[in-house]
């Protein structure tokens, strides 16, 4: 049975932004001592620094967490090469260790494991990445228990829905950056389309934020937006959406779904004879594994935001090598294609090392103050936090094409906001039909 646009799937409920954050904040609350948030006791004296790492090793976001633990271990080896980080208050260098725990790509589980890292493991610092599904509940726990937290790979506005923040700091792109990158690609072929955009924006923090901000900006730029409404994550029947897009003559499609959900939608588009001239996404088609999983040639010509690549002209503050060298090292060690989260996971350790050196202490307030004062050039670009606790990192546009070394390779086709990141190919238009 097909689903009407915005209809709830039986057995699943549409979660509001308030419900999402409430669920994330109170996950694992039974572990709390008393009903009021309060600082966690200092860790027992130990001869190392401990960083907590909630990570989606499994579940729908597992492709985002795939570079771990390889990249974590590489960064730690560089940090600990000469004995670790000199902590002035300890009067000596301390090695850095991490505790990596699977969140199963679930916000409640993320809140639970984060609270355990704080209350049971007494981590000195938290690092969390990979969409607001991970970042928001982990940040909520760090705020609750006053633990400094470095966040990345979570679009800023979606992350800010869980604020205001005192202890958590995010470096990543903002939604206006991705909107402008997408519009730049669409404007380049605007004379060959009806400028009618269909949105696949689910009922989660990303979907709600993107629907609001994309719609406003696209209408300002003369685009018609066909929004079928919010729908539950996990939706697998898109017949009613496709019928609406056909009726409204949608020729550009955009999505911010988890990869398995978009894969279902995109396959059904082809099965039901709806092939837009362009399809541009973020989260669902970031990963090589996600586009390959579409099957056949369904990835050919898909356009996507690119927040990190071998072509980004930035270097590691830990070891001095560039983005391409990190990608090459990953491929040589694992035999797998580079992915965008690889650089951002690495960069969180660049920030952590810099912060701990400047703090000279494991006092959590001093670590928090050091995060706030960060001004560092990293492998993903410069990071300097503003008063809202975030730092913007560069964003360009890319396109998946048939590759020489890999089944699908990502080319840079748009760089209007960041011309220092060079284009590697021209935009293929329209999407090739099978």
Positions of predicted regions on the chain:
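N-terminal secretory signal peptides
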Residues: 1-19, 23
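C-terminal segment of N-terminal export signals and the immediately downstream linker at the start
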Residues: 14, 35-55
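Extracytoplasmic "Venus flytrap"
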Residues: 52-73, 101-107, 130-131, 200-209, ...
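Extracytoplasmic ligand/sensor domains, especially the bilobed periplasmic-binding protein
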Residues: 70, 108, 123-228, 277-304
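Signal peptide-proximal N-terminal region
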Residues: 71-98, 192
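Short beta-strand elements in bilobed, periplasmic/extracellular small-molecule ligand-binding domains
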Residues: 85-103, 167, 219-232
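Extracellular/periplasmic periplasmic-binding protein-like sensory domains
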Residues: 165, 269-346, 410-433
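Solvent-exposed, acidic/polar segments of extracytosolic/periplasmic ligand-binding ectodomains
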Residues: 300, 372-434
């Amino acid at each position: 049975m097909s689903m009407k646009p915005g209809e709830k799937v039986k057995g699943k409920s549409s979660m509001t932004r308030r419900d999402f954050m409430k669920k994330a904040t109170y996950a694992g609350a039974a572990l709390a001592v008393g009903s009021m948030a309060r600082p966690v006791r200092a860790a027992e004296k130990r001869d190392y620094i401990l960083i907590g790492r909630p990570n989606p090793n499994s579940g729908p976001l597992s492709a985002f967490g795939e570079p771990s633990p390889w990249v974590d271990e590489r960064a730690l080896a560089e940090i600990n090469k000469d004995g670790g980080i000199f902590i002035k208050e300890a009067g000596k260098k301390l090695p850095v260790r991490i505790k990596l725990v699977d969140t199963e790509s679930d916000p409640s589980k993320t809140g639970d494991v984060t609270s355990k890292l704080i209350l049971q493991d007494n981590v000195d610092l938290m690092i969390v990445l990979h969409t607001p599904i991970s970042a928001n509940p982990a940040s909520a726990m760090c705020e609750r228990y006053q633990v400094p937290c470095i966040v990345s790979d979570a679009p800023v506005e979606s992350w800010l829905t869980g604020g205001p923040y005192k202890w958590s700091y995010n470096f990543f792109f903002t939604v206006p950056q991705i909107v402008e990158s997408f519009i730049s690609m669409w404007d380049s072929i605007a004379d060959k389309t009806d400028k009618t955009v269909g949105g696949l924006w689910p009922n989660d923090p990303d979907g709600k934020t993107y629907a609001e901000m994309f719609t406003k900006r696209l209408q300002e730029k003369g685009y018609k937006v066909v929004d079928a409404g919010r729908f539950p994550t996990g939706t697998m029947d898109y017949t009613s959406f496709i019928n609406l897009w056909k009726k409204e003559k949608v020729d550009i499609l955009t999505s911010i779904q988890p990869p398995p959900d978009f894969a279902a939608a995109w396959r059904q588009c082809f099965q039901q004879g709806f092939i837009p001239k362009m399809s541009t996404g973020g989260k669902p088609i970031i990963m090589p594994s996600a586009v390959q999983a579409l099957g056949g040639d369904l990835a050919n010509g898909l356009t996507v935001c690119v927040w990190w690549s071998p072509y980004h002209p930035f270097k590691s503050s830990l070891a001095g090598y560039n983005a391409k060298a990190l990608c090459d090292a990953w491929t040589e060690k694992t035999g797998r294609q580079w992915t965008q989260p690889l650089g951002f996971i690495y960069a969180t350790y660049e920030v952590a090392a810099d912060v701990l050196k400047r703090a000279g202490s494991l006092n959590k307030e001093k670590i928090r103050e050091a995060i706030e004062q960060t001004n560092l050039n990293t492998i993903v670009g410069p990071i300097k936090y503003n008063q809202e606790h975030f730092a913007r990192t560069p964003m360009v546009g890319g396109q998946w094409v048939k590759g020489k070394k890999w089944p699908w390779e990502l080319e840079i086709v748009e760089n209007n906001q960041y011309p220092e990141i060079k284009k590697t190919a021209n935009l293929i238009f329209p999407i090739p039909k099978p």
